[in-house]
A protein has these predicted regions:
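Nucleotide-activated sugar donor-binding and catalytic core shared by glycosyltransferases
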Residues: 1-248, 254-382
Length: 382
């Protein structure tokens, strides 16, 4: 059984679902979604043509982490009793993953942790994700680490090496499938151009070398002053580089939208080279990311995806659980510090050699074959 509930989880678990479904003689594949990110989750399910066997549909207006944890835990109790899976696979660091792993543990069902071993060693950064993944790691029977460093983190916590498989990251599997789909389908390319236009950005502006800075931001630890600093830096960059487009697909969370309006004003529809657009489904986001020059983000997954497309990533967080990307030179930490954000974006836009060093660095997160390795590992342990 594969359990997930947010869009990032769905993106990384979808190619694994499809890989298991290729082997019906060896596996009965059961999919349970929690609906922690309802609308954005459904978009990914549609893209990868996945129909869940169970849907907890936990999303409620005004819910907090207590509500999510309780609803997933109780909902999974009943699902696990009915389905009686041999193993439960969860992904990463979400509240869905931790609560589902705990529910499986309560019924003594083995847990497999996809993207295991990521650590910042600071339980409040990112919050609550760092503690979520540490708890899930303690419960897991099988640990699928994306990199050797992730494996080393687990071994330092006395996790048995026999339970760990270094796989690469399944997000690269998903990314390669989607990019291949876009590049080989002219009709789809045109359709995605239309999706972007309806969302608020015309990709036909990107002619004659015009550059695009793609921005995403949604992390809880940045709410408040952090987002104000980020938005102020972005606003000043749009003025410094009027010939560059800045595009920000806004997260639905009001804690994200409020500081944007505080810095940029109430009307976001006519800001010159600054484009605030509606959230994008995964396919459209990859399409836009492929056309970007730089990615400015506080996301975890984008630190893995964007370098796979040769895009430098500036991370608006103080820590990252992906130090392999820092070591490889594909990402740089800028935090929510105004001066760092402005100076690093400026350096990438002004210095070709600096830009090339980041964009041409080798992505440390795998070759797109992670899902096959996970399926083979579990097949050998039946």
């Amino acid at each position: 059984m594969l359990v997930f509930g947010t869009r990032p989880e769905a993106i990384k678990m979808a190619p694994l679902v499809k890989e298991f479904q290729k082997h019906p003689e060896s596996f009965e594949t059961i999919v349970c979604v929690t609906g922690q990110h309802r609308e954005m989750l459904d978009q990914v399910l549609k893209l990868f043509e996945i129909t869940p066997d169970y849907d907890l549909n936990i999303m409620r207006q005004g819910q907090d982490l207590y509500d999510v944890t309780a609803r997933v835990l109780v909902g999974m109790r009943d699902v696990l009793r009915e389905a009686t899976p041999d193993v439960v696979l969860v992904h990463g660091d979400t509240t869905t993953s931790t609560a589902a792993a705990l529910a499986a543990f309560y019924q003594q069902i083995p847990v497999g942790h996809i993207e295991a071993g990521l650590r910042t060693h600071n339980i409040y950064s990112p919050w609550p994700e760092e503690m979520n993944r540490q708890i899930t790691g303690r419960i897991a029977t099988y640990n699928f680490a994306p990199t050797r460093l992730s494996k080393q983190n687990l071994m330092r916590e006395d996790v048995s090496p026999d339970s760990i498989l270094v796989t690469g990251n399944t997000v690269i599997d998903a990314l390669r499938q989607v990019v291949r789909k876009i590049k080989t389908d002219a009709e789809l390319d045109k359709e995605l151009e239309g999706v972007l236009l309806r969302s608020g950005y015309d990709v036909n502006r990107l002619v004659e070398g015009k550059r695009l800075v793609l921005i995403t931001g949604h992390r809880r630890e940045n709410f408040g002053d952090g987002f104000i600093h980020m938005c102020t830096a972005i606003k000043d960059l749009t003025r410094k580089y009027p010939e560059v487009d800045f595009v920000y697909p806004m997260h639905l969370n009001p804690n994200v939208r409020k500081p944007i309006h505080e810095v940029f004003g109430g009307d976001l529809s006519d800001l010159g080279n600054m484009f605030f657009i509606e959230p994008l489904e995964y396919l459209s986001f990859v399409y836009l990311m492929e056309k970007s020059t730089i990615v400015l983000t506080d996301s975890g997954g984008i630190q893995e995806e964007a370098p796979g497309l040769g895009k430098p990533v500036l991370v608006m967080r103080d820590t990252t659980e992906r130090p392999e990307a820092l070591a490889a030179g594909t990402v740089k930490l800028v935090g929510t510090d105004y001066d760092k954000i402005v100076s690093e974006v400026s350096a990438l836009l002004d210095d070709t050699a600096y830009y090339d060093a980041m964009s041409q660095a080798v992505n440390p997160y795998g070759d797109g074959l992670a899902c096959g390795r996970i399926v083979e590992f579990l097949n050998q342990r039946k």
